[in-house]
Swiss-Prot record:
Keyword Cytoplasm: yes
Protein name in UniProt: Elongation factor Ts
Known role: Associates with the EF-Tu.GDP complex and induces the exchange of GDP to GTP. It remains bound to the aminoacyl-tRNA.EF-Tu.GTP complex up to the GTP hydrolysis stage on the ribosome.
Subcellular location: Cytoplasm
A GO-annotated cellular component: cytoplasm
Length: 309
């Protein structure tokens, strides 16, 4: 029997409806001669659409993970619905397998179609795990940090197993310093600092200028309400902006391990000690679930939802 022509739009629609993989959806449509409802039943019988009803649920728990390979590093976030699943060995192994592929894939779209050891794509493997684990799982984001020479520092906070935890940080230091061990130790300390102090940018120039102007406006209005003269207001606003920079700009923050010094001063001291320029080229800080709406449930609702499963 010759294969019937199945449109890409039909495959896409079935995939969105069921959450099954693209190839599985295409096969289901071929097997059912393009009948959409029968294709859904076909996938359900195969266990490939068992995750359908879970797709709409909020996944704000899970794990962040890092992987470093020489001068290249990657961080990912994979979400689950509960912390209980995040401590499940099956879920942890899934995250490990994904982060190992992420460093090769270079971007999230390429990662989703990357093949795992099972032969399935990352996207298909996640869907299969939704069916077996029983919660909505999502590969939310990834980012790459690369340097040409120097050291990459990393830190994982609330680590559940090596390199997997609630907060993951990568810091890239570009430098020709010969003492790589000391450079790596500095990069590690800065990574821990970033985890604890959550800077918004490396320096003032790279800080979101819209954010700066918003803060400036708030400070101005607040000072104006205090009835200060204009020339005093201007000085007060500039003083408050400087304080704001010291709170959100990495180089201007007081260093976690030497609070009397700023990060910029610590780097300058390290440059003198190592005899080479050191530059923070990039940092990445992934905090689990940041920016995701968290579903609030009372105890009665939670028990009711469990009994319905």
């Amino acid at each position: 029997m010759s294969e019937i022509n199945i449109s890409a739009a039909a495959v896409k629609e079935l995939r969105e409806k069921t959450g099954a993989g693209m190839m599985d959806c295409k096969k289901a449509l071929i097997e059912t001669s393009g009948n959409f409802e029968e294709a859904i039943d076909f996938l359900r019988k195969k266990g490939l659409a068992a995750a359908v009803k879970k797709f709409g649920r909020i996944a704000s728990e899970g794990l962040t993970a890092i992987k470093i390979n020489g001068l290249t590093s990657v961080v990912i976030e994979v979400n689950s619905e509960t912390d209980f699943v995040a401590r499940n060995e099956q879920f942890q192994n899934l995250v490990k397998d994904i982060v190992n592929l992420a460093i090769i894939a270079q971007n999230i779209d390429a990662l989703k179609i990357s093949k795992m050891q099972s032969g399935k794509s990352v996207e298909e493997e996640i869907i299969e795990n939704i069916a077996t684990i029983g919660e909505n799982l999502t590969l939310r984001r990834m980012d790459i940090l690369e340097i040409s020479n120097g050291a990459i520092g990393s830190y994982v906070h609330n680590e559940v197993v090596p390199h997997l935890g609630k907060i993951s940080v990568l810091v890239g230091l570009e430098s020709n310093a010969k003492d790589k061990a000391k450079l790596a130790a500095l990069a590690k300390q800065i990574a821990v600092h970033v985890a604890g102090n959550n800077p918004q940018s490396i320096d003032t120039l790279s800080l979101d200028q819209a954010l700066v102007e918003r803060e400036r406006k708030v400070f101005f209005e607040k000072s104006k309400e205090e009835g200060k003269p204009d020339h005093i207001i201007e000085k007060m606003v500039e003083g408050r902006i400087r304080k704001f920079f010291s709170e959100v700009v990495l180089l201007q923050q007081n260093f976690l391990f030497e609070p009397k010094l700023t990060v910029a001063e610590v780097i300058k001291n390290a440059e003198q000690e190592l005899g080479a320029e050191i530059k923070i080229t990039k940092f990445i800080r992934y905090a689990l679930g940041e920016g995701i709406e968290h579903e609030e449930k009372n105890f009665a609702d939670e028990v009711a939802s469990i009994t319905k499963c």
